[in-house]
């Protein structure tokens, strides 16, 4: 079922037309024939089709996935966090009137905290690169923008989120096969709470700084 060039009216009829097509195919003895819907689909359109009883076996998702249409621009900028002087690392900070542009000095390391009982992700946080989180002890974290928002985390597991890819210009990382990458991504999504994953009014996932 392809909506290319036929406008939004046709696109809104995909659920209905897929049901009609399924019946026609089945009546003709082509029960094993699959129906694919494509063209500018995203998770919201796919959800609507499914809720409308669309008889679609697979969805072709193209530009909406490739370009991340809801957030097409990543506002990322490299900022100096430290310099080496006389063999020592000296932290550096950028000062700005805009709080969001003030950097955290020195080399850093991201972590993810998981609830030990449920396995669900609690929060992501940033520490200095040489720090190690002792997850046998309570841990206090706070929001970097609203620093009065603090939380004591207990009964958790702390896992670092980065691995070394290059060392002195040489690749030291063995890239896993795509099947393993896919499996890992699915497992990580399963660690998120349903309230974070829902389409409408999702809870904000916590990204914090440790104390």
Protein language model regions, located:
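Residues that form or flank phosphate/diphosphate-binding pockets in enzymes
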Residues: 1, 16, 44
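Gly/Ser/Thr/Ala-enriched C-terminal appendages of enzymes
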Residues: 12, 23-28, 33, 41-209
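Active-site-adjacent beta->alpha loops and helix N-cap segments on the catalytic face
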Residues: 13-19
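Small/polar loops that bind or transfer phosphate-bearing groups
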Residues: 37
């Amino acid at each position: 079922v392809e909506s290319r060039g036929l406008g939004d009216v046709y696109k809104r009829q995909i659920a209905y037309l897929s049901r009609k097509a399924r019946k026609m195919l089945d009546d003709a003895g082509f029960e094993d024939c699959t129906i694919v819907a494509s063209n500018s689909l995203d998770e919201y359109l796919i959800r609507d089709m499914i809720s409308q009883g669309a008889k679609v076996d697979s969805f072709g998702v193209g530009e909406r996935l490739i370009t991340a249409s809801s957030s097409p621009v990543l506002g990322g900028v490299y900022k100096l966090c430290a310099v080496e002087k006389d063999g020592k690392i000296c932290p550096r900070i950028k000062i700005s009137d805009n709080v969001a542009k003030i950097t955290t000095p020195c080399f850093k390391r991201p972590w993810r905290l998981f609830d030990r009982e449920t396995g669900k992700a609690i929060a992501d946080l940033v520490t200095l690169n040489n720090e190690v989180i002792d997850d046998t002890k309570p841990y206090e974290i706070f929001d970097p923008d609203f620093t009065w928002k603090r939380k004591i985390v207990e009964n958790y597991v702390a896992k670092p989120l980065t691995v070394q890819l290059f060392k002195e210009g040489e690749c030291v990382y063995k890239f896993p096969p795509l099947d393993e990458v896919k499996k890992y991504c699915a497992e990580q999504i399963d660690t998120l709470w349903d309230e974070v994953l829902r389409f409408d009014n999702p809870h904000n996932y916590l990204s914090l700084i440790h104390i």
